[in-house]
Amino acid sequence: MIFPVTLLAFQWHRRPGGRALSRAAMEVAFRGVRKVLCVAEKNDAAKGIADLLSNGRMRRKEGLSKFNKIYEFDYHLYGQNVTMIMTSVSGHLLAHDFQMQFRKWQSCNPLVLFEAEIEKYCPENFIDIKKTLERETHHCQALVIWTDCDREGENIGFEIIHVCKAVKPNLRVLRARFSEITPHAVRTACENLTEPDQRVSDAVDVRQELDLRIGAAFTRFQTLRLQRIFPEVLAEQLISYGSCQFPTLGFVVERFKAIQAFVPEVFHKIKVTHDHKDGTVEFNWKRYRLFNHTACLVLYQLCMEDPMATVVEVRSKPKSKWRPQALDTVELEKLASRKLRINAKETMRIAEKLYTQGYISYPRTETNIFPKDLNLVALVEQQTVDPHWGAFAQTILERGGPTPRNGSKSDQAHPPIHPTKYTSGLQGDDRRLYEFIVRHFLACCSQDAQGQETTVEIDIAQERFVAHGLIILARNYLDVYPYDHWSDKLLPVYEQGSHFQPSTVEMVDGETSPPQLLTEADLIALMEKHGIGTDATHAEHIETIKARMYVGLTSDKRFLPGHLGMGLVEGYDSMGYEMSKPDLRAELEADLKLICEGKKDKFQVLRQQVQKYKQVFIEAVAKAKKLDEALSQYLGERTEMAQQEEIYPAMPEPVRKCPQCNKDMVLKTKKSGGFYLSCMGFPECRSAVWFPDSVLEASRDNSVCSVCQPPPVYRLKLKFKRGSLPPAMPLEFVGCIGGCDETLKEIFGLRFPRALPRASQPSGHLQASQALNRMDSSQHNLSQPLVNRHTRPSKTVAQALLPPTTAGESNSVTCNCGREAVLLTVRKQGPNQGRHFYKCSNGDCNFFLWADSSHSTGGGTPTSASGPPGSSVGCPSSVGSHMDGFGSLGSDSDGGTPCLCGQPAVTRTVQKDGPNKGRQFHTCAKPREQQCGFFQWVDENVAPGSFAAPAWPGGRGKAQRPEAASKRPRAGSSDAGSTVKKPRKCSLCHQPGHTRTFCPQNR
């Protein structure tokens, strides 16, 4: 279930940078604040921070989420005694996804996903957390964000802000910045609150949206196609794509292919050894090796002719082995993989756990420089109690204190990873990783190992050979850092100019070897070098390509590409797009940094990147057979696919914006046949335009209406059934249903809240109303003038002309005011007692419609009038007297009389006693409960349009009485000025000879 977050709640107007505020400004801002809501990224962090700020005197309460508790405590903040309400989220509170209509894989062509609307919503499993925040916000005057101080943490902070400010827009919002959960760090953060940094959050929004669009489009493309091409192998396989996944896979494939393409070469070299009482010294040839056997053999033979060695040089110099640099995230992942055999994902999971427990500083950092204001002495002192490395820590303090070896990188957010608290209670990999971080920190703060290196160079037949020896003078950091090795290599004493007989002089052969497969540490190093992902996401991308079976691991934990991974990379490479190369993603990562620095606009980056990947996608789909061919080399015979349309559904093209929700409305086909215009916001928005059954074909034209708003409103190519339109109207034409074409408004039953502006139409496009009016004026030459086609159409007729509805295809009943009509029941005794009807909810427009005829199953139109039950049925005001072809009120071409349904009327005879007994009349042929209310005497010559004439402009839709339309005597009267009393007329049909009680319409 999805709970969309109101877009207005996302409007955040603080300054983009996370600047610090002066204490005076903060004291002013906190005046009157009694309760402060504090939100951390995880429950453990919230508990730890609350415990430190309250000195252990916090009060725990249950939140609506059982995993996220609430901790209350009193605190003195900026001159105010306040109650702090500390709670947490569980990572990201909100998620990005496409709108509902795009989420099903078969709902659209994947290309649409590059432009489809995306919404940010709260997943169902986080709703309780969201409700907790909303509930607590009501009672608080300020909000302090305590999420992790990195990009993701900043973005999570803004998600919290959006939720809370939707409840209380004037809520004061501040940001706590810290790198470790220690008493000093959290109190310092409280005393130096800053503003949240919108720019950093924007960078995450851009990355999330691009990952969603690019990943979803390519994943659907690959999966849907390849599952059909290789059904036996990939029928159940998700073949995902990610702009970081593929370059990561590309590194593995590239190394594997380099090994495959490697051609070994034989080389030759001369080796000299000299035995002495302490061992054997090996002298290496200064030429190293030769690939020419003959040349090496000649030199070897020269050496063998006079094998006496002469010592030509003895050098001795100090040698240092550098201690490790301060630890950043990438180095932690690499070293843990190499030294501890813990993979990167598990390393970061454990490191996050140690951080929230307060044992180490924040583990996601690009910094390898300790800040000068960090108290390293206190951190070293904490470790002096340990039985394994405590003595070494004490030695550091006794020798002048810590002197860390710094690197050259800083993210200006967090210090290098270091221990913040001593513990001896950890077990398993938790203990091993904590010990590594402590030992690395102590080694970094110690001294380099010192030694003395001796180099001896000898000459044999003018060929030079060299040997190296080492004596370690001071181990220093090596005493605490067992992960590095440096051993003595003793040499006997050689005097310059002395001679000795080598023990062996031999020519040996060898062969060049290919590079090794990548280890996880190698892969992370390549990702960092080429800007693929961040220190926080390297492990995630590696795990993804393993889970998708794109790569596997050998027995010695090296990456080997699988058949699927190889085929995908080779397939895309054969298209000419090096999607497995890091360039595209590296550009994006660079742009994200520029967004964080305020040097690039988020929307500009989004547009550029979407367009770039969209173009690649279009061409990749066009060349998809190359992907099939590449994979067939690894997966076997493929199934031929004839048409692209067989795999992907056609893209719905937007026709206009929905008047209700402003989303696109697209042309769709009903299951039962026929067409309708549907809102892309379905099911949240159910706006639709149902086309009548007379429409045989409908498609979007590329021309845009210059009148209708909001633009663009595309015209439609329409084809109607023969006989459904007036004879002079073409059955095929291009028309607009945006509201400017009055006749199409009537045909399609369009209802608009207000009249649209009218303007001249571009030439070349025929409007239905124009064709109809030309037909009326040229062929019928009626004495009654046509109603102005610019007149706003009657809501009643718009409703009456709606097509028959089936299950799931309904339009709400709207009165002439544009409001939803109210459903009532006839209470008065009579033939219609108990019958339901619709009426204007405000009583403003005298709208009336029988409920049982609003959804006629017989294909007719519903009974609709502008009067109370039993009154005359009104004609549409915008159609007037030219209704031929749509159910004319006059005689049709073959002499029959159609009713309001457009069907031939039947002739009946009055059976009741009275003056009209035996008189014939025309009425609707349908059963009584479905009749449209049409009535006409057979012996009466009724001019077209005189029956229930159209409403006068401004007359609130009331039907005009025939006698009001003309005061002239009826045709056939011999004396126009006669004063003979007129007979009483029926109040229903306005005909003489009977009353309402005996009217055939009131049966």
Curated annotation (Swiss-Prot):
Highly expressed in testis. Coiled coil: none annotated. InterPro entries: Topo_IA, Topo_IA_2, Topo_IA_AS, Topo_IA_cen, Topo_IA_cen_sub1, Topo_IA_cen_sub2, Topo_IA_cen_sub3, Topo_IA_core_domain. Its main location: mitochondrion. It holds the Pfam family Zn_ribbon_GRF. A zinc finger (GRF-type) spans 815-854, 899-941. A zinc finger (C4-type) spans 658-685. One of its GO terms (biological process) is resolution of DNA recombination intermediates. Zn(2+) 1 binds at C815, C817, C840, C845. Keywords: DNA-binding, Isomerase, Magnesium, Metal-binding, Mitochondrion, Repeat, Topoisomerase, Zinc, Zinc-finger. GO terms for molecular function: DNA topoisomerase type I (single strand cut, ATP-independent) activity; single-stranded DNA binding; zinc ion binding. Residues 197-617 form the Topo IA-type catalytic domain. Its cofactor is Mg(2+). Residues 35-179 form the Toprim domain. It comes from the Eukaryota. The keyword DNA-binding applies. Residues 400-426, 856-888, 946-991 are annotated as: Disordered. It is found in: Mitochondrion matrix. Its EC number is 5.6.2.1. SMART domains: TOP1Ac, TOP1Bc, TOPRIM. Binds ssDNA. Interacts (via N-terminal region) with BLM; the interaction is direct. Directly interacts with RMI1. Component of the RMI complex, containing at least TOP3A, RMI1 and RMI2. The RMI complex interacts with BLM. Releases the supercoiling and torsional tension of DNA introduced during the DNA replication and transcription by transiently cleaving and rejoining one strand of the DNA duplex. Introduces a single-strand break via transesterification at a target site in duplex DNA. The scissile phosphodiester is attacked by the catalytic tyrosine of the enzyme, resulting in the formation of a DNA-(5'-phosphotyrosyl)-enzyme intermediate and the expulsion of a 3'-OH DNA strand. The free DNA strand then undergoes passage around the unbroken strand thus removing DNA supercoils. This is DNA topoisomerase 3-alpha. It comes from Mus musculus.
